[in-house]
Amino acid sequence: MATTGRSESRLFVRNSTGLVRSASAVDATIFNAVISAPIGSTLAWSIFFTLVAFPGADPVGVLVIAAIINIPVLIMFALLGASMPRVGGDYVWVSRILNPPLALISNLCMIMGGLLGAAYFAKFFSVFALGPALVAGGSLAHNNTLISWGNSFQTDKAWILAGALVMVALQTYILIRGTKSTFRWQNGAFLIAMFGIVVAFIVLAFASKGGFVSNFNALNSSFGGGTAQNVIATGGGAHAAPDLGNMSATLPTLFSIQGFMMWNFWSVYMSGELKSASNRRRQLWIMFGALAFDTVLLIIGALLIFHVVGYHFMYAANVAPNK
């Protein structure tokens, strides 16, 4: 008996490859905010550094200017990211809009900057994070061992290298675990940092300048240092004052702050992992949400510190080690 074959027309359905977009809008917004201007380190390193490097700097006013300058940049990246969400960065954009050699140069610079930045922030972890945290904890607990460890992480090259290698190893482990795991670590660290920032802002909001001076004098004397007034006099802070109209101070301050503030578009490099990456409104909300978060918290932090500590003291405290 002959078997009659039947031809069937079927709708082709693509079988899943297991490639799932893992990043939500919240993940991407936090990613942009923390990679661009982590609040604590930006206040300590970029903003207060400008007080001494460029006398007359007005960090609060410059932060507003920096935010305005970033608006057209973010619009451009958001629209390009939504138009070509799977290309994973600006190589395709630059090569199509300008030419491929410029795209290669641009991305090679990005790679080298990333490598140098990884080394810098690994050292940053030892010198500006781990060391001061141990010294502060040891001072509050009257524990000389913690203070000694903290000083070693800031001054001893072997301790600095050990702390940096631990950070690099931890980052490598996190990235190897994959995108979802990376964002869990990122968001967990973000929540811890935000808790510390909120507590610090609340303390500053209810603190007084007189209370700060009294506590500073008591703590600094335990290390053999002088009073707050001595610091101001030694650092020449008595006549320091912000002047936004002073272009000799404002322009270099703008470049310094933009070094941190200009990266709120960075999520375009992971658009292949972002859910609904082709949605323009979503891309705009992610980038502008990060910009608003950074700008508002940095301005609040600077204003609170200047209110309690004073512009004169912050200027002198940053210049005093160089005297």
Task: Please provide the spans of the model-predicted regions.
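Membrane-interface "cap" regions at the ends of multi-pass membrane proteins
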Residues: 1-60, 70-75, 219-228
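Membrane-interface loop-to-helix entry segments
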Residues: 23-24, 160-223, 262, 284-293
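Hydrophobic alpha-helical transmembrane segments of multi-pass membrane proteins
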Residues: 64-68, 108-116, 166-173, 250-258
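Inter-helical loop and helix-membrane interface segments of multi-pass membrane transporters/permeases
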Residues: 53, 122-166, 172, 209-250, ...
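Extracellular/periplasmic helix-exit of transmembrane alpha-helices
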Residues: 208-217, 289-323
